[in-house]
Amino acid sequence: MVNRFNRLTSKEWLPFQKSWFKYESDTKLYSDNLRFFCKAEPSEEKVLYFGRNFDLVSSIGKELKIDVTTEDQYDGPLQFALIDLRETIQGIKDLSEYIVLRDQVISLLGKVYRHMIHRRFVCILMPNLQLENQYLPLAWDMAMQISSMYSLKDEKIGCLNLQDENQVESTRKDVFYSLYFRKDENSTGIYSPHVHNLLNSAQDKKIESQRELTNHVPAWFILKPAPRKKNEILHPAKYPEELVLMFIEKFTDKDANILDPMSGTGSTQVASLKSGRNAYGTELSSYFAEIATKRCSELIDPQAPELFANKVANNFVILNKDARLISSADFPEIDYMITSPPYWDMLNMKGAENQAKRIEKGLQTNYSESDDDLGNISDYNYFLNDLIEVYFNLLNCMKPGSFLTIVVKNIKKKGRNYPFAWDLASGLMQKVHILPEVFWCQDDINLAPYGYGNTFVSNTFHQYCLTFQKPN
């Protein structure tokens, strides 16, 4: 296949498609983006740069035979726009300063829209921001606002290498976003404000607990879980016990009550019991509820004691029940909730590569065929609103000041990007406080050459671990 999009070989194309990367230097960051998003042959079409490192970007452009210009100097067609807000964001002292910056970016992108070549990209580099005890997901807001003008196509997470992994302060300067937008048949260039709760609730809600609870959860981590056992492989979307263990040990003490309302094969409950916590949950599928119960029972009362290092003394209850119907009468008061919901109806996408592999092995490809299954709702907004209501109801079962962690990712479906993680956070922030996000970065999956030679489509190898606090 001929590459008409950029100047990379097929071997060079693949690494850029990974949705997270270890940041090495600004030089490499800029160079990688210019090489990927600029045309294969030298062109009179320029690159617009907005930021504090014009001299560096311009010098890289000269080496690549790309003409880099600024907002004051550009004229004629543009093949790429690179907007670097990282340093500017880190210097912001309050929300009003960000609004001024956001308006400046919106104005700039409105002006350059007619100069952008059709189906070419805009990249915005920026972090979210911690201000004292308020967390502001500014990158999510910026993406939502710009998506009314340009099509939101993708994101990559820049992960900064840490000198001492034991001295991590979640997110502040440890990760940043590379947000990618495209001028195409679905964009208009006309700004329309996107209404959400990401910044409104941040203005008057503050985290009420001691910050050290989150200071030791890394902003990003690579997890290589143990191979799934036979009965665990049966579930199409299991998350690893190692991940659960990392969070419950940071957010709870021994004998705490842990809840997962969408238990699957019992990863949360098994990790909780092994770490000396009480484990509770519900599971809509009787099939998976039975597997989860059996796994927990083996820990409490092992049939082959010689295979288990220690017999578990804590309690567990797993109900075969719709999470929508959970009440405070079902379980003791909950100290912490960790869960991973369905990623909309993505498991019903029959053409997905992972689905094809499971079908070939005779494994189940979705959670269930039940009409009550959230994963079978086809309308995105209905699905999102139902899920938010599930979590709002579960707050009634949780102690004041307790935490909940939700493992999710943004979704690409039929050429469109649905910011599921951001939309879910926005909905929940009507009633809970958000903490800095944590990224589970996957490094053990083969890359696929999506869009090769035509456009940019990343391989989504990062998941959001979103943590919230119930107000006191």
Residue ranges of predicted features:
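Class I S-adenosyl-L-methionine-dependent methyltransferase catalytic core
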Residues: 1-472
